[in-house]
Amino acid sequence: MPSTSKRPTAIVIGSGVGGVSTAARLARAGFHVTVLEKNNFTGGRCSLIHHEGYRFDQGPSLLLLPGLFHRTFAELGTSLEQEGVKLLKCEPNYMIHFSDGEKFTLSSDLSVMKTEVEKWEGKEGYTRYLEFLKESHGHYELSVREVLLRNFEGLTAMLRPEFLRHLLQLHPFESIWTRAGKYFWTERLRRVFTFGSMYMGMSPFDAPGTYSLLQYTELAEGIWYPVGGFHRVVEALVKIGEREGVDFRMETAVKKILLSEDGGVAKGVELEDGRRLEADVVVNNSDLVYAYEKLLPIKTPYAESLKGRPGSCSSISFYWALDRQVPELEAHNIFLADEYRESFDSIFKKHLIPDEPSFYVNVPSRVDSTAAPEGKDSVVVLVPVGHLLEEDRHASQAHQLSASRNGHISSASPPDQPGLTPTEKQDWPAMISLARKTILSTIQSRTNVDLTPLIIHESTNSPLSWKQTFNLDRGAILGLSHSFFNVLCFRPTTRARKPGAFDAQLLKFGVLGRAAEVIIDAFRGRGKDIKGLYMVGASAHPGTGVPICLAGGALVAEQICGDYGVDIPWKEEERKGRDVGGKRKLDVLESPMWLDSWEQWVSVLIYLLVGIFAWLWMKFR
């Protein structure tokens, strides 16, 4: 504990999922916590857009890995149900639309999957599907246990024997596409079981095979949706925090993080209006690259190296209010491009919008009637696109969420519009028009429904607005990439890093420089950390996605409590055998001892007798 007898103080910058969950945990542990949010709403990307009775999830719309949500609320001494968060199961998971008019229903129902898989790959195909589930189940369990619930503060964390012995089982050096090819022998099914890499902001041809865990959680645990929108989870965490005494201050932007003269200790923050707030602990939940580049008082080579790391994709997102329901669309729909690999190359190599993109269509009103007026639908379309290039990173003009009515939409993309097919630079107005035109045309050709005359209101987000509203580096909606050299000990750590003596030189060597940086930092020990400054969110360990950021919030809170000698309430409760993380002591699984049945003893005796007789026969024959 700090030397003062007062409660230790903490400031959290940003009220995203990672920030509010960390704040609630710290407050429960006895910290006096203040959350500073630049916008007038909480949740960051996990927020809502409203228009005359229509409701849209601005960012996440799929609740995956439900165990991590239940664990978070249990460790905060409550539950989703107690906080009034009702989860609805989406069935089917997705309707996948192909360019040839065929459809594939993805479901957590094995009987449905048996029919769907056997339609394309026969009975042996279903057997291979079960083998795929077995492998992805291994990826899921190992990743949660050894990665998501553990902190990787440096090289030594990655060299743990219990982790290394499982490393190759995670298939980090093979792509999801390669692993899928071992189980699915048609191009169609390989596409069905790899598009989910988009949720990590990566191409399936580059994403490590480990991330088939996403397919596993969808297929085994299902896809869920909170009634009232995904922001209901954030609202519940905010209420828990407020009960514990957290002070949430909206429209309070942070100008910089205050450090000691030697840059080794965090002292507090300076606000945009010039006020200074002091604290024992500062937790940054703003975009990590932005924080290192803009909030720390001195720009360092490390901040420069973060800007040079590969980022995830961005998106052009449309939020459409329809004047009637469209039953041809399920709650979750995927429209896959015919030129599958080329579409991902356009996004991740050229940083443009593909000529024919794969895209996701969410109809929240299909599962939650409160998302739209009676008899109408709210529709969200997410089109993955390349993140901002260097020339657009520092765009000075404001780019906010934009809105328009049908008169603008129906004529927004005439065939002769100039600049409609940008191929060499990021002409965002043209790319948004191109995306709208392509999406409406694709939906019509594959469902026989023309949405254009049904849209009575549209809001849009683009990489520019993502950057402007949420300070996202390059407008990358999922933070830094999750390639191998951007995860585990190579990902920015939860403790903020002080500049190293060789950072400028290592900057020139890319991935090799990053590996060398990790090795050097191992020798620097705690001397590499800025004391009292921590990072939580998509670009810090363990990574991106709402459930992953919840796991990150737990890691950071436990790390802070350990650093300041504060008891961790949920760990104490776990030791006392209370219901934490969904299990009591009576429910802990223990594998049976070997030789615990008479059949095993008889088998051993038979083997011994056969062995003895064989030895005697060989000796005395």
Curated annotation (Swiss-Prot):
Locate the region Disordered: 394-425
Please note every region of biased composition (Polar residues): 397-414
Protein name per the record: Phytoene desaturase
Q: Can you tell which superkingdom this protein's organism belongs to?
A: Eukaryota
Q: Which GO terms describe its biological process?
A: carotenoid biosynthetic process
Reactions it catalyzes = 15-cis-phytoene + 5 A = all-trans-3,4-didehydrolycopene + 5 AH2
Assigned protein family: Belongs to the carotenoid/retinoid oxidoreductase family.
Annotated source species: Cercospora nicotianae
GO MF term set: oxidoreductase activity, acting on the CH-CH group of donors
Pathway note = Carotenoid biosynthesis; lycopene biosynthesis
Pfam families assigned: Amino_oxidase (PF01593)
Q: Which NCBIfam families match?
A: crtI_fam
Q: How does it sit in the membrane?
A: Single-pass membrane protein
